[in-house]
């Protein structure tokens, strides 16, 4: 070990920050964004690309940027150079920047000036800067000399929550101060008789019943807008505020936000507001809501900016995302809801069903059996036909495809189906399929080659009709191809269907929530044992018995694969096939991604919709390749984009318990429904897309609770595709720019996110997000890291198994596979497959003797996870979980994670367990020992010998038929009182001497480091290696009582000589080990508040180490040894 004086201290530098965006400002065709102390510069020039051109790091030191103020130029030209004042918290810095010819350059930078109070606003005054400070005072500052020229307080020295400075010279400077008394104080600093002489307020404006967070003044119209804690925006007619004694009139009291309003901005024709509800509203000056922009996640939108010449609104949120929206007139506007005025004396009867044949033709049927057509362009109703057989009960469905292929189908309660060509209704064809009621109709289209109509009758029989047209197009042919038989259920009919490319199978769904796979024609079933025929006469055309009395009276083709009750008893609402996957939606609020392998349906991933939208009605793939979800949120029809988390369209229709139809093309989107005896139609140009730009994707809407690095992918320079490489196998000559780290983060927002972190670009790419959890996700563990093709076939990419756990005692296991994809910005794509899940309350409900037991607390949370890989790979790993109910639980993962079973537990700690950590003890010529360490809120550590526990009862590893109660872990091998309060961080590292270095960090800011020896003792009654029992003993023990000023939430032993710790005090500290008590080496201030977890890993000898810190944001550091 080198001497202390010869050691080079690590120098940690920040390379990536993902924090809430707190400041935005448009400067010409550029956008300045403040993220922590960093400034992001985006190019908004339509002649080029919307992209980030520069990140200026650490511009404001350790302060958060809250605003930018641009010095006005005499010629008004800001396209080449700009002088910018950047302020936030108590810091101010002035920079002169140039971005001519697309190149960003910093020409001059002033020093960082620290004010004595919080800066609420800044304004340029003839080369100087006026600052509005937190206790109602104004400072005139000289940015060249760096000194205060004048400071004037107000007589009301109250705390401010916002302020606005108005005027271009000191003599006319006006401040509108938002006091904590919910009043606006208007006063004039230049009226002070002497320096530091207080000035009395000229006017007091009252009206809000909450703190005023933001205000904006429009000089051209004499309007002032304020945003408040009371969830309202007020518009005041104030005239010219630079003139004392003016009259103030409240001309608008705008309610539209469901939470506190953070920001407001007045434009010439609009008022923009944004708040805690993550909604940006566009108002008229009369207080009418014109547009609503939704897409950010989490706790709100923190910054807004506007580009009036381009009619843009830019928003920055707590989720670190930046989005650009088009104002009215620039985007695709919804044409609103219009009544089609069906009621007329010439159209008797009551409307029963409605459907859309494309986006401009609408069909409706009445209880008299009349079928009507409405042309949106002509705006006229036309009766196509009338059939008395379709009175009272009638189903109506239009064929899919461009403008409905000109076909629709009707069905009645007597088993009759009518196929109607819309252009020539006299050529309609009738077929009687069943002796009873037709329960449902659906179309299945395979390109332009094949069109099928499926009709469900009594007894679960589904008739499959093949529809074709004559060469003249004036006649159609309807031929029954075969019949299918659904599995028994209470409501035995299908709900939707779709062809599975290339067309050999049909994917159907039924009312009980099952997804079924049928052959598209009977001849495809070569093996009668697969799927098979249910009873005699299967596939025979004509009328079947179809009685619900059952038996085997009627037969049909059975499904070759079934996923029973996938969406629950509410049923499946849509089936869509795209990109080799099957997507299903249901009324359980979830949509599934399925995969067909060897004629069997396999679930891949279950995703939840937006909060509150439990009735999913459909799924569409838009031209850019992304998907949108259709559904009902209470009484509203919603088109939701899961990628951007945005509600693209909202129609107040009254709910889904009515006849409705949806159609979309690239040109337009239409939604029709019945309400109050009339047909209502909503149309929007541009289909299901919204012309907005995501300048930067958001990460998480709430705090990050865990960060876990999975592996490193090397981007091959000659091929431009990634290849998997373990960090320890990197060649000494490999360069950092080729490396991309794959990191998993989990959050309080119930999502698990997979990120790609390149080593050079200073950016993060969100590859995918998993939304299976119903509560917060607090811990993630990774195992089985490798390549997609396995060791024998090393394909480019990375694969791993992931276990996530959190609130409501819920645990999920899924696999990820990261593969090359040149079409994405990161050149990577991530495929996720959900494998298994487990919840403690569901486990207890399955017990036969549950009436004798106290049910597990449903509020139990998993605080930490650790993977313990056994010597027998066929058995899978163990997952240890630290639980808030005082238990340490062991779960067994089998069948590559598809079986997740509770194996054993212990309540040794008798209080909340915060951390678990597993490690192995390996000695030559001896068996590998598996050890587990747990830490609780009382500061105690417990060590468990898992190998001995499993040896004494080998049947534990065999999944029993009836698992009953879990096994007990017994007593720990060693207990240790390391701290006086809770332990939030824990890590171990083996030493060269065969011992283990153990370090822990506590809530009191202390560190505890000790050397643990594992000695093998042989039992007298045992023979062989099974009789070896380890004895754990502490050799050396050291403590650092005041290592940090707050909770130590991250700790990593990098080597036997160096350790790094992170704390809520926002310090990343390096410690020297190996010379007795740990000694301080170096410390770096990071910018993530309330850091909850940290992970460190070596990248390459040239690039050194990387460290990811997660809390209310994400920050990545790197350093060289």
Swiss-Prot record:
It is found in: Cytoplasm. One of its GO terms (cellular component) is cytoplasm. One of its GO terms (molecular function) is tRNA binding. The modification N-acetylmethionine is found at residue 1. Disulfide bonds: none annotated. WD repeats lie at residues 53-97, 105-143, 147-189, 200-238, 247-285, 289-327, 335-376, 381-422, 425-470, 476-520, 559-598, 604-642, 645-684, 739-785, 848-893, 901-946, 970-1012, 1036-1073, 1079-1121. GO terms for biological process: wobble position ribose methylation. The keyword Chaperone does not apply. SUPFAM superfamilies: Quinoprotein alcohol dehydrogenase-like, WD40 repeat-like. Together with methyltransferase FTSJ1, methylates the 2'-O-ribose of nucleotides at position 34 of the tRNA anticodon loop of substrate tRNAs. Required for the correct positioning of the substrate tRNA for methylation. Required to suppress amino acid starvation-induced autophagy. Enhances the STK11/LKB1-induced cell growth suppression activity. This is tRNA (34-2'-O)-methyltransferase regulator WDR6.
């Amino acid at each position: 070990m080198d001497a202390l004086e010869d050691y080079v201290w690590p120098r940690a530098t920040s390379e990536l920050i993902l924090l809430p965006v707190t400041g935005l400002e448009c400067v010409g065709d550029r956008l300045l964004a403040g993220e922590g102390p960093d400034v992001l510069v985006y190019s908004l020039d339509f002649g080029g690309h919307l992209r980030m051109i520069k990140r200026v790091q650490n511009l404001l030191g350790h302060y958060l940027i809250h605003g930018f103020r641009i010095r006005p130029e005499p010629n008004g030209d800001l396209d080449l150079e700009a002088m910018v004042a950047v302020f936030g918290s108590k810091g101010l810095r002035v920079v002169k920047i140039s971005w001519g010819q697309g190149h960003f350059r910093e020409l001059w930078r002033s020093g960082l000036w620290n004010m004595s109070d919080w800066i609420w606003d800044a304004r340029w005054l003839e080369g100087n800067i006026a600052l509005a400070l937190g206790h109602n005072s104004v400072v005139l500052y000289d940015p060249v000399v760096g000194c205060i020229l004048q400071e004037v307080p107000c007589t009301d020295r109250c705390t401010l929550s916002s302020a606005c400075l108005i005027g271009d010279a000191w003599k006319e400077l006006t401040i509108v101060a938002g006091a904590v008394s919910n009043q606006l104080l208007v006063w004039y600093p230049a009226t002070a008789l002497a320096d530091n002489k207080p000035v009395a307020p000229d006017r007091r404006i009252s009206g809000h019943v909450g703190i005023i967070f933001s205000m904006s003044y429009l000089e051209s119209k004499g309007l002032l807008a304020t945003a408040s804690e009371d969830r309202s925006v007020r518009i005041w007619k104030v005239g010219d505020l630079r003139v004392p004694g003016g009259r103030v009139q409240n001309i608008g009291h705008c309610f539209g936000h469901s939470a506190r309003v953070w920001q407001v901005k007045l434009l010439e024709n609009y008022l923009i507001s944004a708040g805690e509800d993550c909604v940006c509203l566009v108002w008229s000056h009369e207080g009418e809501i014109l547009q609503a922009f939704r897409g950010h996640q989490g706790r709100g939108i923190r910054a807004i900016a506007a580009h009036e010449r381009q009619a843009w609104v830019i928003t920055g949120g707590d989720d670190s995302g930046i989005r650009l929206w088009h104002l009215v007139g620039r985007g695709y506007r919804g044409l609103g809801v219009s009544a089609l005025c069906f009621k007329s004396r010439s159209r008797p009867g009551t409307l029963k069903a409605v459907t859309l044949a494309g986006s401009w033709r609408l069909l409706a049927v009445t209880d008299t059996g009349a079928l009507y057509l409405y042309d949106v362009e002509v705006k006229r109703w036309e009766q196509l036909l009338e059939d008395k057989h379709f009175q009272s009960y009638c189903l109506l469905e239009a064929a899919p495809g461009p403008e409905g292929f000109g076909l629709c189908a009707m069905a009645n309660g007597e088993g009759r189906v009518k196929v109607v060509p819309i252009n020539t209704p006299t050529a309609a064809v009738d077929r009687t399929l069943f002796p009873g009621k037709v329960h449902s109709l659906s179309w299945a289209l395979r390109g332009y080659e094949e069109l099928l109509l499926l009709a469900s009758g009594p007894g679960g029989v589904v008739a499959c009709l093949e529809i074709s047209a004559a060469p003249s197009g004036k006649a159609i042919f309807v031929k029954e191809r075969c019949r299918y038989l659904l599995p028994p259920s209470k409501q035995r009919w299908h709900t939707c269907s779709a062809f599975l490319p290339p067309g050999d199978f049909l994917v159907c769904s039924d009312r009980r929530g099952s997804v079924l796979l049928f052959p598209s024609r009977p001849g495809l079933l070569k093996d009668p044992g697969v799927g098979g025929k249910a009873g005699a006469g299967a596939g025979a055309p004509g009328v079947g018995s179809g009685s619900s009395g059952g038996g085997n009276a009627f037969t049909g083709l059975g499904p070759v694969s079934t996923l029973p009750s996938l969406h629950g008893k509410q049923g499946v609402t849509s089936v869509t096939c795209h990109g080799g996957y099957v997507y299903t939606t249901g009324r359980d609020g979830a949509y599934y991604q399925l995969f067909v392998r060897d004629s069997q349906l396999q679930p891949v991933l279950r995703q939840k919709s937006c909060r509150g939208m439990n009735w999913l009605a459909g799924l569409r793939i838009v031209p850019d390749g992304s998907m949108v979800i259709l559904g009902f949120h209470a009484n509203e029809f919603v088109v939701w984009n899961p990628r951007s988390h945005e509600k693209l369209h909202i129609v107040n229709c009254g709910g889904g318990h009515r006849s409705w139809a949806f159609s979309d093309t690239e040109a337009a989107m239409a939604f029709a429904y019945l309400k109050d005896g009339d047909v209502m139609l909503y149309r929007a140009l541009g289909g299901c897309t919204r012309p907005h730009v995501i300048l930067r994707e958001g990460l998480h809407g709430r705090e990050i609770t865990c960060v876990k690095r999975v592996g490193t992918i090397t981007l091959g320079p000659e091929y431009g595709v990634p290849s998997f490489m373990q960090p320890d196998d990197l060649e000494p000559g490999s360069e950092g720019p080729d490396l991309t780290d794959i990191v998993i983060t989990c959050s309080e927002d119930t999502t698990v996110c997979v990120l790609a972190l390149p080593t050079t670009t200073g950016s993060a790419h969100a590859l995918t997000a998993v939304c299976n959890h119903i509560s917060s996700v607090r811990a993630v563990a990774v195992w089985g890291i490798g390549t997609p093709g396995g060791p024998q076939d090393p394909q480019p990419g990375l694969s791993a198994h992931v276990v996530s756990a959190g609130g409501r005692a819920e645990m999920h296991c899924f696999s990820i596979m990261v593969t090359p994809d040149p079409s994405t910005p990161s050149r990577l794509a991530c495929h996720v497959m959900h494998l298994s899940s487990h919840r403690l309350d569901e486990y207890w409900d399955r017990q036969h003797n549950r009436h004798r037991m106290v049910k597990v607390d449903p509020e139990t949370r998993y605080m930490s996870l650790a993977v313990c890989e056994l010597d027998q790979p066929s058995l899978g790993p163990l997952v240890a979980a630290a639980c808030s109910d005082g238990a340490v639980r062991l779960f067994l993962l089998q069948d590559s994670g598809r079986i997740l079973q509770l194996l054993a537990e212990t309540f040794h700690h008798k209080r909340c367990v915060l951390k678990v950590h597993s490690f192995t003890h390996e000695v030559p010529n001896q068996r590998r020992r598996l050890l587990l360490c747990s830490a609780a809120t009382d500061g105690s550590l417990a060590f468990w010998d898992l190998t001995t526990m499993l040896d004494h009862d080998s049947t534990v590893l065999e999944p029993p038929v009836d698992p009953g109660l879990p096994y007990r872990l017994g007593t720990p091998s060693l207990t240790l009182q390391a701290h006086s309060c809770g332990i939030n961080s824990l890590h171990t590292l083996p030493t060269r001497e065969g011992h283990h270095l153990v370090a822990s960090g506590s809530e009191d800011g202390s560190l505890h480091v000790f050397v643990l020896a594992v000695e093998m003792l042989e039992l007298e009654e045992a023979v062989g290696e099974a009789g070896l029992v380890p004895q754990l003993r502490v050799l050396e023990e050291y403590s650092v009582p005041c290592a940090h000023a707050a909770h130590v939430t991250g700790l990593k032993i990098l080597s036997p000589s160096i350790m790094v710790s992170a704390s809520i005090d926002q310090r990343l500290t390096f410690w020297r080990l190996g010379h007795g008590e740990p000694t301080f080496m170096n410390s770096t201030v990071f910018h993530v508040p309330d850091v909850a977890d940290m992970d460190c890993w070596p990248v390459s000898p040239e690039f050194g180490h990387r460290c990811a810190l997660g809390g209310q944001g994400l920050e990545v550091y790197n350093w060289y040894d």
